[in-house]
Amino acid sequence: PNSTKMAELIQRYLNDVGVNATIVSYDWATFRRHLQEGLHDSVLIGWSADNGDPDNFYRPLLSCGAIPSGTNRAMWCNEDYDRLLDRAIETEDIDERRVIYQQVNRLLYEKLPLVPIAHAYRYQAFRTELDGMAINPYGGVRFGGVSKVQ
């Protein structure tokens, strides 16, 4: 998704309901500092998980412990939410984890600390002359074990 176009679209929607929003952009270092210091009313930013575990979205984005690092941009802290995350990560039973994450989703739906807007598709192409090349569903390109077929 194009962040500038997305911000402008959101700004228009907010204006339509009487909310005046100003779009402000910063260099990355200033942006990170402002996030960590809570110098924002709202923020538009992306997140990409680097593994398939739901905890890789839920914990860094919204747990109490993620506020100091700046990844919890909502600066939202809910002890019930954190307890559910701890229960989910501590169990190896997939069905039990599914039930716990459904409870997590219900809590997020009720409290709405953030609004997911879009999820990007990632495309990756490679030549058939490469042996051992695999597409990683979490992004990144790994060349270990890749060789060129003669």
Locate predicted features.
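Short, solvent-exposed loop/beta-turn-alpha elements that line the ligand-binding surface or hinge
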Residues: 34-39, 59-90, 119-150
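Short, conserved clusters of charged catalytic residues that mark active-site
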Residues: 26, 30, 83, 99-100
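Append "and occasionally in soluble cytosolic enzymes with long acidic Gly/Pro-rich linkers
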Residues: 1-12, 16-17, 77-79, 83-84, ...
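Long, cytosolic, alpha-helical-rich C-terminal regions that act as interaction/scaffolding modules
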Residues: 55-56
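Ligand/substrate-recognition segments at binding pockets and active sites
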Residues: 1-51, 73, 94, 122
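Bilobed periplasmic-binding protein-like "clamshell/Venus-flytrap" ligand-binding domains
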Residues: 39, 43-47, 91-128
